Structure formats: structure tokens, C-alpha cells
């Protein structure tokens, strides 16, 4: 009988490690979505009734009445694509089980968020594959698989996870269009933008980067017809609901409901809100507070991990998790600033830096236009983590050279260690929920 010997090196190759991390990330997202009721750590769910005006009512009206909202009050202003998909999932579950309870139907709608979150992880890995060799992709996948904001949004009713999916999809689609600008890629990218804007109008923001890539390739064959077809597909798909509400109810284009004085932060200076790092707030608590906090950088650091919620667990776990995440983010930000300063001579891929500036600018503009505590929530800006991971992995792939080769090598080792610590404490945080 042939003796079987387990070969660790052959089993845990870099490719297999990336696959394992992807599977673990998906399992974590699915598990969280299954065990967490829709009313826990949700946003704007409100009553589980067709007579309410929250996200649950939006879904239930589609399932039970088969029609879109008849006003733009409160959460009914939201774009419909996520709720149409969630209503379809809830209707299928009702047909399979015969259960018509409102809580069951709303919980069933979370399936779309969970699936979108898993596909987001896949698209993020695809972006890593575009720019980084497999030997460093495992560090990025560890961060992406276990960063709490991803599985938190994947386990709740709302358009955040699906919005992130389309954000990643249009960026990846633009990268692929740049390599092959044929009709298939043009039409596919237009559909992604249209469905993305039908999920959240903010999907129009990455179009600035896509337009830049289009303009760079304007000498390619049949450029004008392709752009015309792109617009004919993307704009009607993305804007029909806004036009419908404008015509039927007079809803202003780009409308966002008032969030109330209790969340208003516009009375603080721009320096306090944007241009400083509030260390005192960072030290006070690992959790963000939308009713008190106003410092944008610190709020992003906290809400990337914990959203707008607090958790019943030993405080050292979220505190150390925040510490490791902050160190990782600050190091990557420093690397990015150096590469921007040495733009022409700095080695490595520049596109993740451009995306980081784009999405960072979008986040800052959003908080500037809507100076409310909840406008800083990281669930709106999850592409920033993907950009951070891309810059990180590109740096880890660089061969140290020059006068500071030893320092660069030491920094690379330190960042790898931070990835391990961050991953370990993210898993511990999940286990302690």
C-alpha cells in the first residue's frame, strides 16, 4: 500500500493561499448574513410594514403590491435596482417556502447583499491579479477577505454592497476596455454603468476616470459610434427612475433627504473636519459616533472596521484592530504620497493611486456637500480599501534598491506583519460578535 505524505509546500502554494482566503472570505460573509437578523446593525430599515417609509417598506411594497413607490418620501427616493433584485429573491423564497411573514421576506432580501459582497471579493481579486504577482496577492486578499465593513454590508438590507460591486466592476471593466476597446467591452461597460447608476447615482463618479481612458483612446477605430452607443445604453438605464420621479412627483435630480440638525457637522471648520487627524477622538473610543464625531479621517478609519455601531466585547479587541488598521493605512498613505511626489521616477503601477485619489476625492466632496455625521460612513467608500490594498501589494512586489534599500526591505516586512495581525484580530472580532 502506497504511503501518503502531506506536502505542506505543494498544498499551500501562493495560488492556493489566495483561493483559500477567497473561500474563507465568502464563508464569513454568508455566515454573518445567515445568523444576523435584518433589524440588527441595519440602516434605515424602520418598520417591517408596507405602510412605513423605510427600506423594508420599499422591498415589501414591491413584493406584495408589485409596484414602485408612489412618492419620494424618506427612503423611497433611493434608486430601485437593488430593491427589484431583493424583491425577486424574497418572492422566490416565499414561493419555495409558502411563508409570507414580513420579517421573513425582508430577511430573504438580504440574499442580494450577501451575493454582491462575495462577488465584490472576486472582483477585488481580479484587480489584484491585474497589477500584482501571485506571491504578494495573499497579503491583499487577507485584508480584503476579513475587513469588517465588507461582511457587515453583505449582511444587511440596503444597496451598499451592490453599489460597491458595480464600483469595482466598472473600474475593472475600464481596465479591460483599455486593453481591448471592441464593441463587446464597450457595451458591457455601458450596461455596468447603467445598472450601477440604477443602484446608486454615485456610480456616475467613476465615469470621470472612464471618460479619461476613452479620451486617451479616441483615435481607435469607430470611437464616436462606440461612445454614442455607450451613452444610449448607460444613460437611460441609469437615469430612468430619477426622470420618473421628477415627472410624477417633482423630485429634484440628485435629491437627498434632509438628515436633521442632530447629525449636522457644518458648524465645524474645514481644518477640524478635513485637514487634521483628531488623535484625541481616535484614542477616546474605537467606535465612530455619527451624532458627535466630525473629523473625516478618523471617522473613516473607525467606520471601515465597525460602521456606526458599538459591540459588546472586550475593548482591547476593537482597539488593537483599529491600531493595526490605522498603521497599515498610514503606511500605505505615506507610500502613495511619496509615489505622487516622485510621479515620473517612482517605480510601480500608478493607476491604483489615481483611483485612490478619485474615490478619496469623492468621499471628501460627499461630506462637504452633505456635512452630516452619517455622510462619513465608510460603507459609501469601500473602494478606498481596494485602492489601499492595490498600492500595498504593488509596493510589496518592488525589489528594494538604492540608498534606502534596507529601510524599504524593513518596511515591507513590517507591512506583511501588520497584514497578519490585522487578519488575526479581524477574525477574533468576528468570533466575539
Predicted features by range, described:
Residues 30-42, 46-77, 81, 89-97, ...:
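Extracytosolic helix-loop segments that constitute the early lumenal/periplasmic catalytic or substrate-binding loops
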Residues 4, 173-179, 206-235:
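Perimembrane helix-loop-helix junctions
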Amino acid at each position: 500500500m502506497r504511503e501518503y505524505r502531506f506536502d505542506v509546500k505543494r498544498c499551500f502554494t501562493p495560488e492556493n493561499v489566495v483561493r483559500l482566503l477567497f473561500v474563507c472570505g465568502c464563508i464569513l460573509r454568508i455566515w454573518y448574513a445567515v445568523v444576523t437578523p435584518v433589524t440588527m446593525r441595519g440602516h434605515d430599515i424602520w418598520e417591517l410594514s408596507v405602510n412605513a417609509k423605510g427600506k423594508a417598506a420599499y422591498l415589501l411594497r414591491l413584493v406584495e403590491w408589485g409596484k414602485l413607490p408612489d412618492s419620494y418620501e424618506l427612503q423611497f427616493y433611493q434608486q430601485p435596482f437593488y430593491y427589484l433584485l431583493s424583491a425577486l429573491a424574497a418572492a422566490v423564497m416565499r414561493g419555495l417556502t409558502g411563508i409570507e411573514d414580513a420579517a421573513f421576506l425582508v430577511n430573504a432580501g438580504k440574499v442580494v447583499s450577501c451575493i454582491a459582497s462575495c462577488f465584490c471579493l472576486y472582483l477585488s481579486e481580479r484587480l489584484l491579479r491585474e497589477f500584482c504577482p501571485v506571491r504578494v496577492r495573499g497579503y491583499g486578499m487577507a485584508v480584503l477577505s476579513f475587513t469588517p465593513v465588507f461582511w457587515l454590508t453583505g449582511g444587511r438590507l440596503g444597496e451598499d454592497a451592490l453599489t460597491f460591486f458595480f464600483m469595482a466592476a466598472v473600474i475593472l471593466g475600464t481596465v479591460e476596455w483599455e486593453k481591448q476597446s471592441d464593441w463587446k467591452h464597450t457595451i458591457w461597460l455601458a450596461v455596468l454603468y447603467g445598472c450601477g447608476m440604477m443602484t446608486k447615482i454615485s456610480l456616475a463618479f467613476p465615469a470621470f476616470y472612464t471618460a479619461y481612458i476613452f479620451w486617451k483612446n479616441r483615435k481607435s477605430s469607430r470611437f464616436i459610434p462606440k461612445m454614442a452607443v455607450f451613452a444610449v445604453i448607460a444613460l437611460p438605464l441609469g437615469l430612468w427612475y430619477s426622470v420618473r420621479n421628477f415627472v410624477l412627483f417633482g423630485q429634484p435630480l440628485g435629491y437627498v433627504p434632509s438628515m436633521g440638525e442632530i447629525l449636522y457637522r457644518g458648524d465645524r471648520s474645514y481644518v477640524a473636519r478635513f485637514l487634521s487627524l483628531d488623535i484625541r477622538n481616535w484614542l477616546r473610543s474605537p467606535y465612530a459616533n455619527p451624532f458627535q464625531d466630525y473629523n473625516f479621517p478618523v471617522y473613516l478609519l473607525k467606520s471601515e472596521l465597525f460602521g456606526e455601531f458599538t459591540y459588546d466585547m472586550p475593548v482591547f479587541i476593537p482597539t488593537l484592530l483599529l491600531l493595526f488598521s490605522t498603521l497599515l493605512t498610514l503606511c500605505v498613505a505615506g507610500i502613495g504620497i511619496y509615489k505622487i511626489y516622485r510621479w515620473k521616477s517612482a517605480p510601480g503601477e500608478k493607476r491604483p493611486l489615481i483611483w485612490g485619489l478619485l474615490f478619496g476625492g469623492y468621499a471628501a466632496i460627499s461630506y462637504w456637500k452633505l456635512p452630516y455625521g452619517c455622510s462619513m460612513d465608510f460603507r459609501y467608500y469601500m473602494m478606498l480599501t481596494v485602492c489601499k490594498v492595490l498600492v500595498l501589494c504593488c509596493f510589496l512586489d518592488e525589489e528594494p534598491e538604492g540608498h534606502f534599500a534596507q529601510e524599504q526591505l524593513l518596511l515591507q516586512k513590517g507591512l506583511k506583519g501588520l497584514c497578519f495581525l490585522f487578519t488575526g484580530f479581524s477574525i477574533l472580532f468576528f468570533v466575539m460578535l
